[in-house]
Amino acid sequence: MGWALLQNTNPGPDDYNYLWVNAYPDINTAANNNMWWNNSEKVVGIKPDILFSDGSKYKFDRSYTYQMKLTIPNVAPAGYVLLNFTSPDDVDAMAASAEKYVLPHFKKNMGDHGMVGWGMATKITPQGKDYSSVMFYDSYDTLANAMRHLAGESVMKGLPFDKMEKAVWEMRPLMKVIAATEAKQ
């Protein structure tokens, strides 16, 4: 479906600086060993050993796999993406709450606040007490609009928080979009 390279806008000394995101239409495609980077010379004319050379310069974290549950596809290119991680007691209740309250509210109001896309995904791997089980993302056109979201302003106003499943955010990094492809609809 597409990919994006994101840069953390405020990393700590031991945090990651960049995040590479691959989006696939389904689990089978994500688990396919014949992905383009294994056949990069045929697909883009660059040998795989060039793509993977000099990895000693980089510190890699692990791979995290999520499955999209709800989405408002981007209506314009995103400049910034806010990643919101949480581990609710009841993932299904959180998804139902987001579908009932957040999705229609954002669809109706996002254009007035620079929000260009939104989604909710559940963690496939890794799982456990040290890993968030749910991730929401909010895509914005500008840094200022993303920061208004973090401040509880803009599109966040008017959400019925008293009716929604409570989210305790474990981490909310704000990422700058360095490069991205457009998802095919």
Predicted stretch roles:
Residues 1-45, 50-185:
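Short S/T/G/P-rich N-terminal loop/turn motif that feeds into the first structured element of a domain
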